[in-house]
Amino acid sequence: MLLLQNLYSEENYSINPDLQDNFVIISALHNYDLNPHTASYSAEAQILTGLYEGLFSYDPITLDPLYALVKSYRVSRDKKRWTFILRDDAKFSDGSQITAKDVVYSWLSLIQNPDASYSSFLDIIHGAKEFRLGEGPAENVAIMPVDDYTLSVHLISPASHLPKLLCMPAFSVVKNAENVFSGPFVISERTNDTIILKKNSNYYDAEHVNLKQITLKFSNDELENTYNYNIGTVDWLCSTFNNEKLLSKDSLQLYAEFATQYYFFKIRKESICSNLTLRQALLEATPWEALRENVYVPASTLVYPLNGYPLVQGYIYTDKNEAKLLVSQAKKELQLQEQSELKIKFAIPDTEYMIKKAEILKEAWNEIGVTLEISTIPDYEYLSSISKCDADLFTYTWIGDFADPLAFLELFRGNSTMNVSDWKNSEYDSLLDKAALSTDEEHNKLLSSAEQILLDDAILLPVQHPVSVNIINLNAVGGWAANAFDIHPLKYLFKKETKDMIPNIVMLK
């Protein structure tokens, strides 16, 4: 496989080093987890692109894998044995050499971390799943250093998507030490509302990192955020803003995202939502048109539409009469009296958007005799609270980490570390396993069959395919390009000489 080698650069653009002293980003207020093994939010992944690097990294435009800590690799004839040749000039920020043993340490640390959402992606490696589940030793995991700069990895089955997978921050190379980084920047200062990154002088490609410093500020104050952007003290705004007060409308970057927002049931023995018939009743009664009103791209399925991916039957119609019949049947299956009250709990982030959507469901489900209790959780705590929350229904917005249906379907694999729903289906898992052995048309056909099983089991309510929203003046900033993952590697950013001037506004430098 030939990977892209050229760094992102703007054609014939001369970069002025005098402008690169500081680049200011405002991001949403959040308890940021900057451990690449346990980070789950896309906003965390964005920062991690500047702090850590793995064998591959994202091309900032195409998102194809670029060589990072490797300079080449080869794959055996049976496609199961991968040999990676590491760069011999790569160092950690403390000046120590990065070797194949560091990759082994990093991946084994990821696999054995119970809080690592992405660790099950490495189950494709011999011995990894057993080690993750505590059923086998680390020595049996087929990640082996041949020498200081050669790494051998043995897979259970072919996985042509492996380089794309290894672009993700979770598979970065880390050192067993505090504040040591493998990427283009290091953390210089950190407070509750600010993180300052400094250029990593020991980074192997430091000469192509233009910014000397990046200041990350965290704020959900839309008026203040917009004001600071308007006067030029902020270079990139990716938090809340006031569109009416935004002076430079050309700065609004709105693009389709490889993502889906959906609600899902958590399967718990003590919950009535473990009953399939009741879940089917709730989905039959859902007013899909109202639920998807005022969204950019309505979603009726989980997987974002991809070329070559067969259509599956999603959720598009409402039938309250059928829903009422199903509720009666569900009560019999649950051994409840016909007059028994049915209550389920929906835990949501405390945002105006989600409160409105939850009220739509509450009203609709009340008409079929089901009471929906709505519980709010602070937005910045929501994702981490799901595993320990006793609610029945939750909301998720998932951005695919690589361009394959598996990026979504892995969320519901029975033993996946990303499966927070606790739904399990052996036929579904088997189809995912078979798809890993297949390519192209057959691969997609198997995965679409798996998705149909998931949808038929009424475990989720697809709502929308979100769009990414960023405020950034591309006449003033280079190295930034819209893409389907809304990931913009910090390494490539730089300030341009030209900057749009807005009448009657003093631009602060």
List where the protein language model places each region.
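Surface-exposed binding/hinge segments that line
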Residues: 102, 111-112, 117-174
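Aromatic- and charge-enriched surface segment that lines or borders ligand/interaction sites
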Residues: 71-119, 272-274
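Gly/Pro-rich hinge or "lid" segments in bacterial periplasmic/extracellular proteins
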Residues: 60, 139, 149, 154-213, ...
